[in-house]
Amino acid sequence: MTLKAEAGIVLVDPRDHHAVRNIDNVLTLYQMMINENKAEEGTAKFLTRDYIQHNPLIADGSASLGKYFAGVKSAHPNAQVVVHRIVAVGDYVFAHVNFVNLLTDDPNDKGVAGVDIYKMNTDGKAIEHWDALQLVGNSQNSAPWVAPDIPRANSNGMF
């Protein structure tokens, strides 16, 4: 099954060929960069060289992101991304994702929920990126980033 088939909700105006292409490019970027362990190849293909990165852990530039995820896959070979929702409007692509085994090799890892925002150029390459990341909890510890043993207030789940 391809990542495109796994994307639960895809919102895009099918008449907006640039937005459709931008979604395809971001989905393929995720697939190559994380799931196929081709981070440097994927970032070279789908990001501009002077790509602006707003995540403070990663330097600007497509090469920096490629090296970062190559390092992640080297440390955690089972790291994967699952795209749950993806939306394209104009030059922007918004993706709601789960990065599993990004930080650990635990087979029971619940992952890191993320919302990625990409600004794309007219050629369909990402020129800028923002993200918000949050550890995914479980029924016994719904907010591991706050404190241990905080019970869930609802059963909705993150995705």
PLM features: residue spans?
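C-terminal and inter-domain tail/linker signature
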Residues: 1-159
